[in-house]
């Protein structure tokens, strides 16, 4: 079984995907981490983030061992990831990796921006997670503070709105809800309530009550 979870930054889709994978005994891939790793690599090189050829080379040479680096969660790396993920050659370099992961039995839960529309359009279950931008900014602020990083909630909100616009308007795989994806508004759900809502969707699809 392949479960595709898409949505904007800080919507809670990553936590939801990880918990959903554990519930069903599936592997989990946070595809945003892959793009963050490319962004971090470009920052380390001091390269222009819009240098498509260099970014594609970084993507092709990614080491999965770096996916657990805490530095990937920084605001600067997140912004860099949003820029490089809009580059068609970067996306092309990473598509095969993601599809191989998803197609390996017994299946997987993948979360990102274009899982249900581009990476795994054949996924049995597709969920599109949304949350109010103000709520998302608050979550990001608390996450940064928990890591001991300075965080200005107003600045983070502005960055989130800017990223949303960039993700939705990019030419390559823009952020959008797949026609057959089920909407889950995570604005006011805690982790357990969000997981329960997602499980209800999965079970309804498997039972034929939802399509």
Curated annotation (Swiss-Prot):
MF terms (GO), sorted A to Z: ATP binding; CMP kinase activity; dCMP kinase activity
Source superkingdom: Bacteria
Keyword Membrane among record annotations: no
Keyword terms of this UniProt record: ATP-binding, Cytoplasm, Kinase, Nucleotide-binding, Transferase
Record's catalysed reaction(s): CMP + ATP = CDP + ADP; dCMP + ATP = dCDP + ADP
Disulfide bonds: none
EC number annotated for this UniProt entry: 2.7.4.25
Protein residues bound to ATP: 7-15
GO cellular component: cytoplasm
Subcellular location: Cytoplasm
Pfam families: Cytidylate_kin
UniProt record, GO biological process: pyrimidine nucleotide metabolic process
Entry's transmembrane regions: none
Family: Belongs to the cytidylate kinase family. Type 1 subfamily.
HAMAP family for this protein: Cytidyl_kinase_type1
Protein's name in the database: Cytidylate kinase
